[in-house]
């Protein structure tokens, strides 16, 4: 599938202007959500003088401006068919570069996500068209109740065909006739055989695919974690083994002043005010492979997490990235704190 230029706005996205004889430079940013046209006037205009007569290079980090147009206030909504991704979870960016303030050098269009690159990838990394690694194998919880089970985001260039292929060779297809950012569902009817399903996107002669394999759990309540991953998209992860919920309360204790010496022995002389509590949950992944460390790492680095549909923050701050050569059986335990007081105090 042809690559589309993208911006990962949690990492710096550097625009560089270094032209002979320039004394200043300018960047115009046009930022908008959805599939409509670019704004008629720049959303932001940035300019600066060159550092010196011998150092003409000027650089701009546009990521902070882009992030203002992306939010994940709306949880992932699953559908049986391929549908457009919520327009607030990505945006379009047009960048115009100018020598001095009037000489237009070029105009470049991007699709921006709230993703990031690792240090080893260098600056302005390209993370691909998928919100999961291309040609990878992903695992999901199949309870035979939820249809669909999960989804992933993809930038699809039309015309393309999304193909769900079961292990027995049977397929379902959906034709995409409009270029855009889509959520691709993992449909449980195809996965019920227990051998998983491969989702492929075919464009001309290019085929990209991700395999999804179901896992069943009979003993424990499976905990679902929704988080925004490194690609700037919602991703689901399931923790299959024992989980523990803990409540911690806080309050302010005072000594009471008795109104008279004949005090009420049923009242006591100390009282707690403004009592409230928070809840944490510890979850266990169950036995996983070495490469699951990447998913755990992205959960730890996520700024938006839901635990069984409720907003939460990561309480685990560090853990060992395990390897089967050292630890034959790998299990990850994470702790989350729900991001609200147990007694509602929101005004």
Model regions and ranges:
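Preference for solvent-exposed, low-hydrophobicity sequence contexts
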Residues: 1-218
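Extracellular/virion structural assembly segments
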Residues: 2-4, 8-12, 20-22, 155, ...
